[in-house]
């Protein structure tokens, strides 16, 4: 999962002063789940780093724990609003009748499929035979088997990373901006920012029906576009990530015709 | 923090240029670290208390979960218990805290992770001639943990990147104010920073070697076996390169994360002499080692000969055979020739199989290839007899129906 995250992060890094970007893909037949659906959220992979003066990302255990708790709470609240029944896994062994290995296998399989999605949908290696086909990926039988055993309709995989710029780096940024007055300008040394993705799998067919990536940050160290350490920040990220699920291409076209 | 990591791509680091200038100011050679100076920096039951280390350990928890659940692991319980006992012996004060995993990767390596779990590659078990050699590698890896190398190198990296960032910003602002272009100096400083990071990494490897030698001798193993391991590795790489008409990469570059193997071997010899107490009995516990790896030794040899590196494979088999030939080694020696398939190798392999089956412990496959070679040479009756023997030893072999047809 982490590798997938890094690859996507590199792809979406646009040297803008500060922005929030999302880019979602859906199966052509996808209709966002509404009403009485059962959603299984696989262990959300959450990390919060502190960005050192030199620009290194240092993982912070306390912030990470805080953010994970907040993200899970925000997810539960959001799905409840939509009418779905949600179970959020914190460990691999929480599903009755499903072994830890089976969950681990599915996570790894999703990571591999997700890498393909990243490569062919986000990193520019577009496949000519797949144009206008929407999101055309599947986790296959394993996902269907999980759905059959547990009775869930969808599985959601999620990754979120937030990097908080340290005081030293902000000071360095101030110096860089101050330098502009003497002719040495470094107004955007960057470093912080958020990155997240979510992937929705239909457990009846095994297909990855919806995929979204959010990037929020600025190239000016110290200016934040959200902070998942706070409940509000987490709710904001979850909303950005899952709030506006667009239906698939064919569903949209059918809706337009009507 | 691995036993021998692969170097970074040099080209990627050369982008800034100025390599020659920087090389003049940074030497590659460094003094040997004395085992006597290597005191463990942590005690039993160590838990991180600093923020950065807690963060690192938290990340490692997830890594360990992935490693522990990986299907690349060899899970033979007796063998794993043996390895766990070994790290429990040579692990110093943290002996009881470390975990060990055995990965099915036919390569010579071992890695220690920051939170105290080690991954041993199966290729390592093939190459070790006795328990002392294996314990040496494990002691080296334990040395990384005991000397807190991961967090120390992370802090070193943090400190140097901070200094570089502040320095280059200050330099730029100062240059801007005075109207001097400082870009070249900044690039040189960047290279200097990178070089000093690699130097620090090599120093830690040298520390782990010294610490390892000490742990080994303390536990009654001959410490010289660590130097022997390097001698074998250098020999293997030479043989592999010679076969491909190339030269071995001698290491020792400015960008090496580990000291050059030759230098490590030389230092380890001196260190071994230092930690050896005259009059004390040291035992390499070879029999115990062979006993422990016996269930997987055939698989290890099989993995190796299929790597398509006949130079290295032949050297390895000959090195293992210095402690005595047996049917298994003879069979795989012949396999190296057969798979190499140079002019005359088929005859050489046929002779090899014939020699192998003379040993009581020859694997069933030796009889199979012996039989097929005989038939190829026109000795039908003898060939069939050998194949019949193969079927008797392995009646459920995947190719049994075909062989049965050949025999009937």
Each model region followed by its residue ranges:
Chain A
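A generic alpha-helix propensity feature with a strong bias for hydrophobic helices
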Residues: 15-18, 99
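Homeobox/homeodomain signature
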Residues: 9, 29, 96-99, 191
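N-terminal segment of the mature soluble domain
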Residues: 54-164, 203, 207
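Positively charged n-region of N-terminal signal peptides that target proteins for export
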Residues: 1-4
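C-terminal/domain-edge helix-coil "capping" segments
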Residues: 19-51, 70, 139-153, 159-258
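Bacterial N-terminal signal peptides
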Residues: 7-16
């Amino acid at each position: 999962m982490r590798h997938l995250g890094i690859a996507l992060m590199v792809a979406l890094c646009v040297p803008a002063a500060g922005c929030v970007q999302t880019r979602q893909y859906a199966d052509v037949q996808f209709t966002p789940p509404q009403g009485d659906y059962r959603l299984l959220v696989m262990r959300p992979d959450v990390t919060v780093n502190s960005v050192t003066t030199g620009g290194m990302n240092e993982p912070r255990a306390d912030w990470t724990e805080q953010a994970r708790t907040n993200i899970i709470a925000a997810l539960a609240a959001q799905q409840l609003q939509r009418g779905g029944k949600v179970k959020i896994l914190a460990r691999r062994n929480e599903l009755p009748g499903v072994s830890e290995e089976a969950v681990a296998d599915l996570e790894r399989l999703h990571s591999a499929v997700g890498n393909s999605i990243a490569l062919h949908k986000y990193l520019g290696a577009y496949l000519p035979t797949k144009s206008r086909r929407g999101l055309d990926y599947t986790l296959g039988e394993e996902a269907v088997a999980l759905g059959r055993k547990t009775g869930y309709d969808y599985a959601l995989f999620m990754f979120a990373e937030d990097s908080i710029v340290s005081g030293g780096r902000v000071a360095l940024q101030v110096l860089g901006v101050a330098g502009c007055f003497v002719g040495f300008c470094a107004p955007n040394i960057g470093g912080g920012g958020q990155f997240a993705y979510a992937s929705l799998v239909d457990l009846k067919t095994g297909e990855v029906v919806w995929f979204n990536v959010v990037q929020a940050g600025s190239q000016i160290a110290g200016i934040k576009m959200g902070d998942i350490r706070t409940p509000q920040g987490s709710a904001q990220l979850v909303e950005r990530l899952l709030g506006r699920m667009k239906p698939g291409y064919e569903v949209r076209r059918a809706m337009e015709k009507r | 923090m691995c036993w021998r990591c692969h170097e970074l791509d040099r080209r990627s680091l050369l982008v800034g240029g100025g390599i020659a200038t920087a090389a003049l100011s940074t030497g590659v050679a460094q003094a040997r670290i004395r085992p006597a100076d290597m005191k463990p920096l942590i005690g039993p039951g160590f838990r991180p208390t600093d923020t950065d280390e807690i963060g690192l350990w938290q990340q490692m928890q997830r890594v360990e979960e992935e490693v522990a659940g990986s299907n690349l692991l060899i899970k033979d319980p007796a063998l794993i218990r043996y390895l766990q006992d070994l790290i429990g012996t040579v692990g110093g004060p943290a002996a009881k805290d470390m975990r060990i995993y055995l990965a099915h990767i036919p390569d010579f390596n071992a890695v220690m992770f920051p939170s105290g779990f080690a991954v041993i590659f199966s290729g390592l078990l093939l190459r070790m001639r006795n328990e002392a050699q294996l314990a040496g590698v494990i002691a080296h890896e334990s040395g990384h943990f005991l000397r807190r190398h991961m967090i120390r190198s992370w802090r070193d990296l943090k400190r140097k990147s901070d200094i570089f960032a502040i320095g280059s910003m200050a330099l730029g602002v100062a240059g801007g104010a005075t109207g001097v272009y400082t870009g070249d100096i900044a690039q040189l400083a960047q290279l200097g920073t990178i070089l000093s990071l690699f130097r620090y990494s090599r120093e830690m490897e040298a520390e782990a070697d010294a610490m390892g030698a000490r742990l080994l001798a303390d536990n009654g193993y001959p410490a010289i076996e660590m130097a022997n391991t390097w001698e074998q590795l250098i020999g293997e790489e030479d043989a592999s390169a010679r076969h491909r008409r190339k030269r071995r990469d001698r290491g020792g570059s400015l960008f090496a994360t580990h000291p050059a193997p030759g230098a490590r071997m030389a230092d380890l010899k001196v260190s071994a002499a230092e930690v050896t107490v005259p009059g004390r009995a040291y035992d390499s516990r070879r029999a115990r080692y062979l006993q422990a790896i016996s269930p997987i030794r055939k698989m290890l040899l099989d993995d190796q000969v299929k790597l398509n590196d006949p130079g290295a494979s032949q050297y390895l088999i000959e090195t293992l055979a210095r402690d005595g030939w047996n049917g298994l080694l003879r069979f795989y020696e012949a396999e190296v020739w057969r798979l190499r398939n140079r002019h005359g190798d088929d005859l050489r392999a046929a002779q090899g199989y014939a020699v192998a089956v003379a040993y009581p412990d020859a694997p069933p496959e030796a009889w199979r290839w012996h039989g097929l070679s005989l038939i190829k040479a026109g000795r039908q009756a003898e060939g069939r007899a050998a194949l019949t023997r193969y079927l008797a030893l392995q009646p459920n072999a995947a190719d049994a129906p075909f062989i049965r047809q050949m025999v009937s």
